[in-house]
Amino acid sequence: MDFIFKCVSGNEIVFKGLDTEGKVKGIEGYKYLLFDELDHYLREEWNQANISLRGMPGMKLFATWNPVSEKLWIKGYLDSMEWDDMPLVIDDDPYTQLHHNSFVRRSKDGKTILIKTTYFDNKWAVGGEGYGFLDQNLIDEYEQLLLLDPNSYRVNVLGDWGVPEVSRPYCQNF
């Protein structure tokens, strides 16, 4: 099923499910493709999408994921590239300032941008000067997670790569 958002300008944003490999191979007429939760896809599926869209002017692949394990193919893929750090703020605009635990990097070949953000960058949770709001309950939950499950805190709060742990397998099964 497709979901289509029509903008006032007349542009459309089309959300199309690509839940089978055949759909990715047959995609036509799209310039942008978003993989939400890339950690749930195989490297081969990412490669197939890249091949399917190659040659289209302005084609871009986007992906979001949580770095749940340093053993994910994504980490190896990113580690194989060389990166340049980019500024954490655009034109001294405080609304674009990223937290010190975040980063923006561009691959040396200029084909890939990597942006790491955390909840500290979400001004609708942590508040901002003149905008957003402070969600103290959410912040308290995140900070409690540090005490209960440091690995989950590292992944879900700080956005760092997770390290598989088996020290408390009973607790993590329930």
Label each residue range with its predicted role.
Residues 29-46:
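SF2 helicase catalytic motif II
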Residues 122-174:
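ATPase catalytic-site recognition across NTP-hydrolyzing enzymes
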Residues 1-31:
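Inter-Walker segment of RecA-like/P-loop motor cores
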